[in-house]
């Protein structure tokens, strides 16, 4: 990914052997790719409080924070109605079943950008399940991708890491993003090439922008991809060991990371 060629020092004969082996591997094995797409919903306020949603690339740090999204004891969350409505719109556009009952749960883990020590997310009862979309790669191949689920959750804060010599580096945290509404769209592992993954991600972005629920501006981090990549023998229905590639914020990164893996 960095552009460094780890095989440059090998003699031509060994390179030819490696290239032959790669071709044989491609004939015998296929890639299996599933994706998780995190999309910030376009609401005026956060998921569980009245704090405004601000552009974290320009806003003064830690100015859109309250006891709820700051994780102070005793603060009670109240769900954002518009975020729920937007999540339902996306579910319908993805041919999902909209569940009559949905619930939130605490996803417990420790990280400095998570002030409560848990993330409010949906686990057992997501708002939308069992959908699908059809996409087309550049070579005209149609690919039907299943949508396992789409669920709502809150975004984390944003960390800024500063390196310094002598171990004097430090990290600053901006909580303006903490609590911003997110919709996580989880696909089935139905893609078998980086081209198919690109077509799927592009289609999801188009749908979100058409519905007006997300700007699609990946430079601002409002749309982030995670690719789950494995390989298996061609014809096998058993999934291989999965590698999860997180926080891909561009189509180019998605394609290069998937191809590399």
Q: Where do the protein language model's features map onto the residues?
A:
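Short Gly/Ser/Thr- and charged-rich N-terminal loops/segments
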Residues: 11-14
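Short terminal hydrophobic/aromatic SLiMs and anchors at protein ends
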Residues: 16-18
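Basic, nucleic-acid-interacting segments
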Residues: 20, 24-261
């Amino acid at each position: 990914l960095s552009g460094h060629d780890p095989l440059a020092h090998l003699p031509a004969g060994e390179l030819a052997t490696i290239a032959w082996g790669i071709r044989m591997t491609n004939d015998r094995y296929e890639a299996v790719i599933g994706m998780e797409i995190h999309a910030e919903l376009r609401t005026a306020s956060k998921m569980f409080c009245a704090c405004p949603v601000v552009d974290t690339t320009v806003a003064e740090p830690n100015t859109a924070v309250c006891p709820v999204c700051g994780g102070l004891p005793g603060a009670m969350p109240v769900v954002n109605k518009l975020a729920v409505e937007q999540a339902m719109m996306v579910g319908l556009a993805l041919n999902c079943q909209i569940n009559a009952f949905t619930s939130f749960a605490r996803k417990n883990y420790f990280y400095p950008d998570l002030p409560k020590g848990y993330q409010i997310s949906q686990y057992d009862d997501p708002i939308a399940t069992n959908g699908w979309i059809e996409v087309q790669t550049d070579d005209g191949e149609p690919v039907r991708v299943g949508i396992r689920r789409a669920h709502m959750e809150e975004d984390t804060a944003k960390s800024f890491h500063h390196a310094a010599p002598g171990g004097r580096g430090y990290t600053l945290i901006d909580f303006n993003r903490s609590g911003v509404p997110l919709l996580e769209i989880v696909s089935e592992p139905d893609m078998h090439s980086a081209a198919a993954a690109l077509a799927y991600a592009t289609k999801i972005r188009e749908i979100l922008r058409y519905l007006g629920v997300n700007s699609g501006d990946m430079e601002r981090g409002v749309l982030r991809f995670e690719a789950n990549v494995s390989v298996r023998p061609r014809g096998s229905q058993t999934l291989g060991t999965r590698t999860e590639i997180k926080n891909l914020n561009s189509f180019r990164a998605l394609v290069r990371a998937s191809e590399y893996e």
